[in-house]
Amino acid sequence: MYAIIQTGGKQIKVEEGQTVYVEKLAAEAGETVTFDNVLFVGGENVKVGSPTVEGATVTGKVEKQGRAKKITVFKYKPKKNQHKKQGHRQPYTKVVIEKINA
């Protein structure tokens, strides 16, 4: 059984026991999180939401909070001696999917 959930402005396909990286959630390591925006549930009984499936939830356990690898943004204007170098590290939450309730 699998489901498509929406979190952090992104849609993610998840299965039970899978580890996923989502946008930062307000939860500490070891806490249980519930995703209510379930768009699709697949398997033997397929359920398609419009926009979400009624009563369907996905629960998971937060493994850790972290930050992704650093990316470098460099803006440059030729002939003007103008440049700007900037770095960014996106925060994320590592979640293990425990149960899909449909």
Curated annotation (Swiss-Prot):
The keyword Signal does not apply. Belongs to the bacterial ribosomal protein bL21 family. It comes from the Bacteria. Part of the 50S ribosomal subunit. Contacts protein L20. Keywords: Ribonucleoprotein, Ribosomal protein, RNA-binding, rRNA-binding. NCBIfam families: L21. InterPro entries: bL21-like, bL21-like_sf, Ribosomal_bL21, Ribosomal_bL21_CS. One of its GO terms (molecular function) is structural constituent of ribosome. GO terms for cellular component: cytoplasm; ribonucleoprotein complex; ribosome. It holds the Pfam family Ribosomal_L21p. The gene is rplU. This is Large ribosomal subunit protein bL21. It comes from Bacillus licheniformis (strain ATCC 14580 / DSM 13 / JCM 2505 / CCUG 7422 / NBRC 12200 / NCIMB 9375 / NCTC 10341 / NRRL NRS-1264 / Gibson 46). This protein binds to 23S rRNA in the presence of protein L20. PANTHER family: 50S RIBOSOMAL PROTEIN L21, LARGE RIBOSOMAL SUBUNIT PROTEIN BL21M. HAMAP family: Ribosomal_bL21. GO terms for biological process: translation.
